[in-house]
Curated annotation (Swiss-Prot):
The keyword Iron does not apply. Belongs to the arginase family. Agmatinase subfamily. This is Agmatinase. The gene is speB. Its EC number is 3.5.3.11.
Length: 307
């Protein structure tokens, strides 16, 4: 038996085809697979207000993930992800390019089908608007959820078009998808409303307070509700993630973001996404690498609960 250095996966092939995130198997019928988590790319950026290009984010995250796949286990975890969690990558959602409504409908339908088959989802954007149809699907399955939201922007603005990557978390509470009083926004450092019920841990707090103190507040706020976890890559300082459409200085380091993510392990996380990676503005793939690493940490969180 030949063992590839990429993810300790058996590989006797003489030819190579496109591969999934972290070289997980591609499965275009994930609903009938034995997977526990399904990775879905959403190459959509029509709701962007700044620089476009995040539609190429899913491909960039997958491509750079081969730099992570050679490790049999990700530091500092003490187990192999592949041994604890069944994951497939089902590729990208297919929709009519240029039709935001069609994307929203197709993504929600796909998510509802995945969840109905007993699986859970990790999605790659694409701009942050994709989280809204995902929340609609998850709320149908899990009921009203708490939101744990890493971002430079609160995305609670009431203005904007029907499809806008700055209004999802205005619409989501109004549609009854999430409970803002049990939701936390982390790393915010732009103008935002203060009377909408969300707990906002702005960038100054996140950078100045201890990780343990922050995690205690997050856990107390969320309680035992089902949690949707969304990570906009512009939560990170542009020094660590320049490749995004709306960068804002003064953000989180990758070290602090990873420590906060690892501390979310006790939460009942039912869905996750990583959004707003725009490789056209990246340098040496560091933004894509940050996105891929954050996605991998999210999967390790889920795998750790099975040990």
């Amino acid at each position: 038996m030949t063992i590839s250095t990429l993810g300790n996966q058996q590989d006797d092939s003489l030819v190579s085809n496109a591969f999934g995130f972290l070289r997980f198997p591609l499965n275009f019928q994930p609903y009938s697979s034995d997977a526990e988590w399904v990775i879905t790319g959403v190459p959509f950026d029509m709701a962007t207000s700044g620089r476009a290009g995040s539609r190429h984010g899913p491909a960039a995250i997958r491509q750079v993930s081969t730099n992570l796949a050679w490790e049999s286990r990700r530091w500092p975890w003490d187990f192999k992800l592949h041994n604890c969690l069944k994951v497939v990558d089902c590729g990208d959602v297919v929709f009519n390019f240029g039709d935001a409504q069609d994307m929203s409908d197709k993504l929600q339908a796909h998510a509802e089908k995945v969840l109905a088959s007993g699986k859970r989802m990790l999605s790659f954007g694409g701009d942050h608007f994709i989280t809204l149809p995902l929340l609609r699907a998850h709320a149908k399955h899990f009921g009203k959820m708490a939101l744990v939201h890493f971002d430079a922007h609160a995305d609670t603005y009431p203005n904007g078009s029907q499809f806008d990557h700055g209004t999802m978390f205005y619409h989501a509470p109004n549609e009854g998808l999430i409970d803002p009083h049990h939701s936390v926004q982390i790393g915010i450092r732009t103008e935002h409303g203060r009377d909408n019920g969300f707990t906002v841990l702005d960038a100054d707090q996140v950078n100045d307070r201890s990780v343990d103190d922050l995690l205690a507040q997050i856990k107390e706020t969320v309680g035992d509700m089902p949690v949707y976890l969304t990570f906009d890559i512009d939560c990170l300082d542009p020094a660590f993630a320049p490749g995004t459409g709306t960068p804002v200085i003064g953000g989180l380091t990758t070290d602090r973001a990873l420590k906060l993510l690892r501390g979310l392990q006790p939460l009942n996380i039912v869905g996750m996404d990583v959004v707003e990676v725009a490789p056209a503005y990246d340098q040496s793939e560091i933004t894509a690498l940050a996105g891929a690493t954050i996605a991998l940490e999210m999967l390790y969180l889920q795998a750790s609960k099975k040990r």
